[in-house]
Amino acid sequence: MKQYLLITKPGIIFGNLISVAGGFFLASRGDIDVALFLATAIGISLVIASGCVLNNYIDRDIDSKMERTRNRVLVRGLIPARNAAIYGYLLGIAGIALLYATTNMLTVWLSLFGFAIYVGAYSLYLKRNSVYGTLIGSLSGAAPPVIGYCAVSNEFDMGAVILLIIFSLWQMPHSYAIAIFRLKDYTAAAIPVLPVKKGILATKKHIVLYIVAFVIAAVMLTLSGYTGNHYLVVAGVISIYWLGLALAGYKTNNDQIWAKKLFMFSIITITALSVMMSIDFKEPHKDGVWVAARMPSIIEHQVKVD
């Protein structure tokens, strides 16, 4: 059973759940439907787990060529490949069924879109054949917070658009940093990521440009009236620091160590933004004016329902 758990990549699921919560609480604006949140979290976790299992199934040949992945479950033959594929499909069906039964069709379609991009477009073709695989794949990585948001709003509004842009832009330097400090692995497996095809210097330039765009997108949540000034300060400071780390790459003597630091801080950055949009959202006042709101209380919600 342990192997069937490991193949779902629990760490990736947990990281995505943080962003799902960010989008969900942002859209809830203090009026949290606990049952809906749990159903959304479990449903999208199953869909993500399905994608991870099927990605492992598809990548088992190239995983054997990379030091980082050569000990994965399917590479070592700890689970039959056919069983893994069936397991992956069942997880996906269960996740979509739960979302269909408890959320709305927009959430279901967004989940299917993210799954199709990751498994169909990225894993099956783009990862092995195109330098643009990271760019297209970023859409699937940006889907979870948008799904969380739309599970509440049932509307693909400006808030959903901004979330999609923020998390898509974040994916790029995050993924490029991995590609740099794992450059030998990607080269050995002939995966055409940007550092392999264009070199590390070109990748550094792309990283800086994407982080600049990310900074602008991140503050748009406040400028568009979705989050308060506390979010703005945290997003601004942490994003600028991340940009500073990226610029430091031009002077580094060790690209692998620098890229690993950039990667680790990218996780801190997106986690901080997800937390802050959860607790420093804005809600429309009765007269139509946007006002800052504090962290919603589940206890208060239960009293309200009762």
From Swiss-Prot:
Any single Pfam family the record assigns to this protein: UbiA
Keywords for the protein's UniProt record, in alphabetical order: Cell inner membrane, Cell membrane, Heme biosynthesis, Membrane, Transferase, Transmembrane, Transmembrane helix
Membrane-crossing residue ranges in chain numbering: 5-25, 34-54, 85-105, 106-126, 131-151, 161-181, 207-227, 230-250, 261-281
Pathway annotation: Porphyrin-containing compound metabolism; heme O biosynthesis; heme O from protoheme: step 1/1
Gene Ontology MF term list: protoheme IX farnesyltransferase activity
UniProt miscellaneous comment: Carbon 2 of the heme B porphyrin ring is defined according to the Fischer nomenclature.
Protein family: Belongs to the UbiA prenyltransferase family. Protoheme IX farnesyltransferase subfamily.
UniProt-recorded name of the protein: Protoheme IX farnesyltransferase
Lineage, broadest ranks: Bacteria, Pseudomonadati, Pseudomonadota, Betaproteobacteria, Nitrosomonadales
Gene from which this protein is expressed: ctaB
